[in-house]
């Protein structure tokens, strides 16, 4: 799975990327002064938006192409520190991206978690391990904003994968469903090409307000 995503970035096949960021984040995020974990962050401009709201933002990404593209496209200067995961730290905003395997991120603690592209990127047999590792990094009662997709996987398949409500609540029973809307026009082109007629974006948040 790791090599799959690295190859997609290498080939420029990144139909899941949202160049303008995620609109649901901007509608529903209210927190400030948090240390926010963003797993499998890619080059999303959501990192900048979260930092501009007064948060310290920490992303984790497999692809060096994605990390380099993020800093170039956002015109951010940065410094690099070597470690088990290479650390790219912006000089102008409180943003850090760790390059490498998310499951090797340890010794960190976060009081907020934003996931727009991680859970839906993982096949079913990888999701429970992702959730368990994420929980190990979060403080008690950490704030969470999760964005998932629901669609007919007989008509099209991921990634990004459909993750339906019963599965989400098995993983995160503390989450409440805030919003559901058809987001097929903003989804990966391959879904429309496959004839998919609906792709529901669902927004979940922890029961404690951000």
PLM region spans:
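Class I SAM-dependent methyltransferase "Motif I" SAM/SAH-binding loop
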Residues: 37-44, 118
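Conserved catalytic-core segments centered on acid/base and nucleophilic motifs
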Residues: 47, 57, 113, 119
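A short, conserved alpha-helix within the catalytic core of class I
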Residues: 121-133
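Short amphipathic alpha-helical interaction patches enriched in hydrophobic/aromatic residues
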Residues: 13, 117-118
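Class I (Rossmann-like) S-adenosyl-L-methionine-dependent methyltransferase catalytic domain
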Residues: 1-33, 43-46, 56-95, 99-106, ...
């Amino acid at each position: 799975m790791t090599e799959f995503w690295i190859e997609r970035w290498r080939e420029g096949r990144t139909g899941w990327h949202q160049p303008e960021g995620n609109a649901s984040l901007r509608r529903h995020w209210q927190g400030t002064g948090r240390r926010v974990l963003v797993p499998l962050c890619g080059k999303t401009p959501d990192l900048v938006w979260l930092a501009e709201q007064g948060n310290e933002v920490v992303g984790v990404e497999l692809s060096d192409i994605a990390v380099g593209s993020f800093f170039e496209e956002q015109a951010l200067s940065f410094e690099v520190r070597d470690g088990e995961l290479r650390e790219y730290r912006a000089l102008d905003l409180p943003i850090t991206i760790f390059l490498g395997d998310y499951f090797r991120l340890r010794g960190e603690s976060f009081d907020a978690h934003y996931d727009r592209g991680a859970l839906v990127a993982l096949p079913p047999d990888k999701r429970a391990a992702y959730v368990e590792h994420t929980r190990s990094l979060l403080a008690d009662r950490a704030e969470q904003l999760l964005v998932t997709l629901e669609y007919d996987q007989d008509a099209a398949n991921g990634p990004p994968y459909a993750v339906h409500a019963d599965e989400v609540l098995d993983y995160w029973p503390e989450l409440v469903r805030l919003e559901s809307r058809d987001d097929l026009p903003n989804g990966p082109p391959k879904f429309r090409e496959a004839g998919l007629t609906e792709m529901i974006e669902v927004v979940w948040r922890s029961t404690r307000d951000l």
